[in-house]
Amino acid sequence: MGWGAVVYGGGVVGASLVGLGWAGLWFLNRRLYKEYEERRALVQILFGLVFAFSCNLFQLVLFEILPVLSKHARFLNWHLDLFCLILLLVFVLPYYHCYLLLRNSGVRRERALLVAALFLLVFLYGFWRMGIHFPMPSPEKGFFTMPQLVSRIGVIGVSVMAVLSGFGAVNLPYSYLSLFIREIDEKDIKTLERQLMQSMETCIAKKKKIVLSKMEMERIQGSEEKLKARSFLKRIVGTVVRSVQEDQTEQDIKSLDAEVQALEELSKQLFLEIYELRQAKIAAAFSRTWRGHAQNLLGYALSVYCVYKMLKSLQSVVFKEAGSVDPVTMTITIFLRHFDIGIDVTLLSQYISLIFIGMLVVISVRGFLANVMKFFFAVSRVGSGSTTNVVLFLSEIMGMYFISSILLIRKSLANEYRVIITDVLGGDIQFDFYHRWFDAIFVASAFLSLLLISAQYTSRQTDKHPID
């Protein structure tokens, strides 16, 4: 391989990683950090690195199919990407996350560094012990090898994927089908808005009372100077009266504070309910358009596929099978078997594999980022101080999620591409186990989501008009 090929390969890899890292930083700052002020530079860099190396795994799968770059360059890129990503996930992120938690709690820098190092040792021990309960490669070459680390990361990542996929398999038809859309009366929304305004006005009035009560306490405390000029008896009586007044005022302030907190919580709930009703009203109006009807048909098709996927996963769990062929591939296979259309089947299967993997990549990345945003905004409501911790946690989950996606996507590839990924990840990895594990968690998550969404839908049906 000449120097020109080396420079070209390095340029393509470097440019793609820089582009992916920039995309990760854009997503973090524009979509996640939009309403939050705390922005640590190192946290952003770590998130961008994990995002770049994670997405590069999918890019490398496409490079193998197209193909792009030489075989040797792709092989080196695989190893470099996995090495850097595992280094970040297993060593850097746990250590730095613990260090930041300690520093934010007021621990001195030297002690935080030491405690974070001890935590990393405990984390590595727990990470190693986790592999005892799952099929793992032979430990002859040691713990810190690519197959050992990828296998353990895969268990966590596949579990996260299965939970998200199980919920999505139930929630997606529920979101798309007009059957589950309820009609919202505008007067219900107006009633809620009046209640929200009344709650906010009452809250403001009580806050004013708190301010006035505090001013009254300051006035009473300021009257001590005047009491010193009076007789001894008058000072005693004044002190007793002032003490009683202060106690009563303090009790009033505490009572008002509790009422204000309750009103603020009520206002928040009313605001969220108004928002949900507005969204439901928009969805109901959209369902009556031609695009809404098309989405409804798509919802029925997706419902059939999701039911099929749940049944096949249940079959895989019950009969301990290693996963089955998806209906799209099955249909194409049957068609080509019965109809000779004069097309090279090998070439066609390669292009179909490319399209299918591309769709899997786009859907997987899009679905993961959507869930990242939901999780981020849900957790970050507790305060801006937790934003950094949430971003680091999401970086950890993101890397594990994408590595696990490669473990599962591998089975959808043609044998020639499957062998390459097997060699890179390690031939000792029990790939079939991850498919069975995914199916088991997927079925449990899907049925639990079905119960929760059914309960939610039933409660909405029994309460057509939530406002009396």
From Swiss-Prot:
It comes from Oryza sativa subsp. japonica (Rice). Keywords: Cell membrane, Coiled coil, Endoplasmic reticulum, Lipoprotein, Membrane, Myristate, Stress response, Transmembrane, Transmembrane helix. Interacts with GPA1/RGA1. PANTHER family: G-PROTEIN COUPLED RECEPTOR 89-RELATED (PTHR15948), GOLGI PH REGULATOR A-RELATED (PTHR15948:SF0). InterPro entries: ABA_GPCR_dom, Golgi_pH-regulator_cons_dom, GPHR/GTG. Belongs to the Golgi pH regulator (TC 1.A.38) family. GO terms for biological process: cellular response to cold; response to abscisic acid. It is a multi-pass membrane protein. The chain crosses the membrane at residues 7-27, 45-65, 82-102, 112-132, 153-173, 297-319, 345-365, 389-409, 437-457. Pfam families: ABA_GPCR (PF12430), GPHR_N (PF12537). A lipid is attached at G2 (N-myristoyl glycine). Its main location: membrane. GO terms for molecular function: abscisic acid binding; GTPase binding. Residues 243-279 form a coiled coil. Involved in chilling tolerance. Interacts with the G-protein alpha subunit GPA1 to activate the calcium channel for sensing low temperature and to accelerate G-protein GTPase activity. GO terms for cellular component: endoplasmic reticulum membrane; plasma membrane. This is GPCR-type G protein COLD1. Disruption phenotype: No visible phenotype under normal growth conditions, but mutant plants are sensitive to cold. These polymorphisms are associated with divergence in chilling tolerance of rice cultivars. COLD1 confers adaptation of japonica rice to chilling and originated from the Chinese wild populations of Oryza rufipogon. It is found in: Cell membrane; Endoplasmic reticulum membrane.
